[in-house]
Amino acid sequence: MKTDKNLSYNSQWLVIGLSRNGYDKESKYFKKYYENIVTYLEENNGDITKAKYSVYSKLIISLTALGKDARNINGYNLLSYLSDFENLKKQGINGPIWALIALNTNSKYEIPKNKEAKINTTEEVLIKYILDNELEGGGWALSGTNPDVDITAMAIQALSKYYNDKDYSDVTKAINRGVKWLGKAQNKKTGGFSCMGYENSESCAQVVVALCSIGINPDEDARFIKSGKSPVDNLLTYALKEGGFSHIKGTDVNMMATEQGFYALVAYSRLLKGQTFIYDMSDLNIEKPKKISVDLTANKKSVSSNEKEIVNGSYNKTNISDDSNEKEVKSDKKSDKRNSLDSNEKINSSSKPNEEGWEFEGKEYNLKNPGEDNRIVQQKNKSIEPTPKLLAGIGSMIIVFAAASFIGKRKRVGR
């Protein structure tokens, strides 16, 4: 694969998909991505956004997928940027969803405490917020009272770690309601899914990933077979002969659609192989963080001796020791935290966005024109185009799944 010198944090989905599909982690492509991330963090002193904190979450996911410890990316603890829960909520429910996914990529990850934060972000705070924002009848949305396919699918992905866990029965029930709603939202003729009134590949891709996250085969489960077509069947109808995916049918290759279609197929492939969920990195050997010492006096910031605390409300570099006695986060911590929020940390469950509008999974919604999906206006992400080799590789994977889906379809018809 040709190394793209312009690889940026926006390349995260290709990195996640390729890495979780077994692409060599020592490749020049991944090394260049990591080098560019480090450079970008240094140039911005770690402060790369003031509104879309899911950027940090997705960086954590992609770097963990490469076997990197996100608590020490050249001295930056990326989890610290998720510490102020009010910041996460600027994107509505999207922020907490991706923060929880990022946190659970590595069982050793914890979000440091932030002395300046009104509400410190914790695993339980994130879970509670997502559950509190479930809509009546099941499902989740960015706003309003009607569930949204993409957000419902992503909420299920975020909560999937706790599915069928006796300590999280409320999570299991919420997921089941969400799955039931998705089944009803599926197009009865095409097997696909719509967002904002039109069918598209990304919504279908998110449903495929969501079902895989809880062990449901999206190509065989009877609840998701409509007119003989499954979500996998539908997703493959957006595949183009040059190897990528289109956003909506009849349009050219779209980078976002290609990324999401690709990693959805990777998630499905991993399910079929009995591997961990695409965002569950417990199968990887994560690099142990080395102890570092960083002088932050130039920034008028200080790091306390307690490595898990953030001082002055803005945290970027830490001292993290490679402690052989460091214990993994155990499941028995669940029961005593479900209702243990401090009285001063009551969560505002409103999904009210910041004034600039919401963004999730590349979909940008302008609050002044809430019916406008910017992906219609701008079909391609001009900053990062898929290379021919990448498209060819994805094309090969599509061919394999198309053949498997055809065989599966024949079996379904014969039942």
What residues fall within each predicted segment?
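Terminal, non-catalytic domain-edge segments
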Residues: 234, 249-315
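Blade-loop segments of beta-propeller domains
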Residues: 38-49
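Alpha-helical repeat scaffolds
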Residues: 28-37, 72-84, 116-120
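C-terminal low-complexity, Ser/Thr- and acidic/Pro-rich disordered "stalk" regions positioned immediately N-terminal
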Residues: 285-385
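An alpha-helical repeat/solenoid feature that recognizes helix-turn-helix modules
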Residues: 2-26, 47-71, 88-119, 123, ...
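C-terminal membrane-anchoring or membrane-association module
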Residues: 398-415
